[in-house]
């Protein structure tokens, strides 16, 4: 038995030593990019030996496998440029550190940046970056030094190509990054403007997905699509997601929109279970201003729900923006109603009653706002198939209740406003101006916060929109 024990211990000790040796060996770094010499031979690497030379036919190349790669005349650079590499007339115009190429954490999902630190210029595809400025490098970009005609390097991005199949107009302007989300009509990707490095969300909408089984003459008409896109692009309000760019193709529409880092309102509600009355009020007030802006311009959203409300930051007090307000204009009416009838939880009763076959007014947005406010305050829906009768029947009759325990701490004024917005008869439902003048929103501290947040966008909002109307002392 003693021998067995010793044998076991010896095996464990041997395995431990092997594991220690493996741990002590440096892990091979991921090569995320490569620089090929174009009119330059890459010979003079820095003494740190972080990079290895690979000879390829008539030129040299260097693998990029660290967070940063520097090039210039200085001896501390990863690539030291000397007379062996460049003609003297060019070398004299090279700075000690001419440029830096970097990719955060060497992650293939992160974009590659090039920063110009030179006095005489670093150029990408003949365009000057500018001292201390950055731009994004893409596969096959050509880097020139001191003058656009001196093409020194070609950059190769070794990460997966996410831009395959996208229009040339998109690939020329944007670096296409990871998927942010997807839905019935297409997907959303994170993109970067290569010149400004600004982030955007690019929504790719497939036209054949929108038009349904039957051909949609409205949607397939390029002039109609482009006209609606122009309307969306001209909208400018702090609480409405801006369209930065639009590319219309026969099979798809590519909409480049503001990127909101705080996610959507639905996830914010889910992660908190519900929102406090103060935060609900701050968010709701901003939503109302967005809807007022749209209604004043003859635009009805038609699909207001927490999924379509985006938050600028992860902070509790943050700017809020309504999105997807123009999508319904692209969609054939019958197709829209088939979609809405599948999940009618935020849809006004008049839409369900008529099946979308009759005209309806802006009051459909007021109903949806009421449902959104109900959800914010309680973390529950006013209408659901789980409540016994089908949700569509509950909506048509306007039957809902404040049964959740969270309603005990909600003010009567908030409930009164919800009651008014969820009136089945649209003629009796308040307008967006009426909602904004409701007693519940006469809250000076909230109005000041909203004013501060809504001006972050650099837009002037009329002062009277934020003034508390004269009223008697409010009661809860």
Curated annotation (Swiss-Prot):
It catalyses: L-seryl-[protein] + ATP = O-phospho-L-seryl-[protein] + ADP + H(+); L-threonyl-[protein] + ATP = O-phospho-L-threonyl-[protein] + ADP + H(+). The gene is lok. Transmembrane segments: none annotated. InterPro entries: FHA_dom, Kinase-like_dom_sf, Prot_kinase_dom, Protein_kinase_ATP_BS, Ser/Thr_kinase_AS, SMAD_FHA_dom_sf. ATP binds at residues 180-188, 203. The keyword Acetylation does not apply. One of its GO terms (molecular function) is ATP binding. The lineage of its organism: Eukaryota, Metazoa, Ecdysozoa, Arthropoda, Hexapoda. The active site is at residue 303. CDD domains: FHA_CHK2, STKc_Chk2. Its main location: nucleus. Keywords: ATP-binding, Kinase, Nucleotide-binding, Nucleus, Serine/threonine-protein kinase, Transferase. This is Ovarian-specific serine/threonine-protein kinase Lok. Disruption phenotype: Does not affect male germline stem cells maintenance. In the germline, RNAi-mediated knockdown of Rtel1 in lok mutant background results in partial rescue of single Rtel1 knockdown phenotype which includes loss of germline stem cell and reduced levels of Stat92E expression. It comes from the Eukaryota. Residues 174-441 form the Protein kinase domain. Belongs to the protein kinase superfamily. CAMK Ser/Thr protein kinase family. CDS1 subfamily.
